[in-house]
Amino acid sequence: MSRRTDQLTDALHAYMLRWGVDEPAPVRALREDTHRLSQDGWQSSPEQAQFMALLAGAIGAKRFLEIGTFTGYCTLRMALALPADGRVVACDITDEFVEKAGRRHWRESGMEDRIDLRIGPAAQTLEELLADPGPGSFDMAFIDADKEDYPVYFSLCAQLVRPDGLVLIDNAFWGGRVADPDDTRKSTAAIREATRMAFERDDFEVAMVPIGDGLLMARRLR
C-alpha cells in the first residue's frame, strides 16, 4: 500500500517498460524513427500509448479520435489496438511529420487504410465531425495538440464521444507548471481551464493519471 504516487527512479522506469509495455514491432520502429527528429520530445511515451491501447480494448472501442498527430506514433498504436472494423480519425495542422516518419510504418503494418488523417485547424475539423458523423460517434478522443485551444477541444470532444466513452487530455501536468500559481502563461492557463471544465461537468467523471506528463481521463456518463 502507498498513500501517494511513488516517483519513478530510472531503474523503476526501466522495470515498467520491461514488464508493462508490449510494444508492437511497427510501433517501436516508428518510435525509433521519431527519435531521430529534433522535435522527438513531442512524442507520447510508450507506457502511455500502451495504457491507452488497453483502455480501448477495455471499453470495446472501434472509433478513436486523435487531436494532434505529430509522426503518428499513438495513431498507429491505437489503430493496431482496435478491431478489424475500427477506425482512427487523426487531426493535425500539418502532415509534415507523418510524411517524414509515420506514413511508411502505417503502410507497412497494413494500418494505413484504417487511419483517416485530416489536415487543418483542429477546431474546424471537430466542428465538421459534429455535423457528420455527428455527436456520440466516437468511443475515445485523445487531445494532444496546441495547448491554448485545449478548452475548445475538450468542449467539442465531450460532444463527439458516446456515453461511457472517454476523453483523454495529455500534458495534464505540463511539466509541473499547472501547480505553480506564479505561472500565468496562456498555455498553462488553458490546460488548467480544460481540467476544470472536465472536473466540474456533472455528465463526466474524471481521474488524473500520473503517466507521461500527466493524463486526464474523463468518462462521459450520459
How would you label these PLM feature ranges?
Residues W42, P46-R222:
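S-adenosylmethionine/decaboxylated-SAM
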